[in-house]
Amino acid sequence: IDFLYVGSNSLDFEIPGTLGIIQHHSITESKPRHYPLYHFSDIDFIDSDDKSFLVCNHMDNVFDQIRALKNCTLIVYSDQSHGIHNQRRFITELMNQNILNPVIIRRTYKGLSKEEFLMHSSVDVGGLQIDGLGDGVWLDFESDRSYVNQTSFGILQASRTRISKTEYISCPSCGRTLFDLQETTAKIRKRTDHLKGIKIGIMGCIVNGPGE
């Protein structure tokens, strides 16, 4: 995680590593790596010299004002079910106008199971990331945060935006596999899951395996 949003709260402990803290602009503290968050209605209060974050809807016309805010990161959200198209159009317009501010893609999901959340977010966010659109991900979901984080990093990894873990590519197994492929894959994972950025192919076929 690069940034942690705490809303109007404060942290009473030392920030670990290089983690940045995002707070609502009305209470942002003058501490290292603390950054204010604004909404589009508050854009006139943004100091162009300070690093900041701006939440905007795909329908907000930020293009003229954002030119002067070179240190501002845009958090672009859509509350529509097919928001991927709206966010794509918004980011494309930024590129057409040569606006180079970083963009975080934000989506919120409610009333879904974990599996549905995984599928929806992978399509909505991954569909943009795979085309090189967006610099970060912000997912909101009614579930444990560890699962949301795991899903976020999985999308970033699958789109080759950020490599954070070992990747395993295994054949689906068939009658030509003479050993327990799932058990073998589990053993390999146990020994190698610390090798960040490595791709490991696991072949079980006695015909194609040796050649590949």
Question: What is each PLM-predicted segment?
Answer:
Residues 14-17, 64-65, 89-90, 212:
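A short acidic, amphipathic alpha-helical/loop segment
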Residues 36-43, 48-202:
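Catalytic alpha/beta core domains of metabolic enzymes, predominantly
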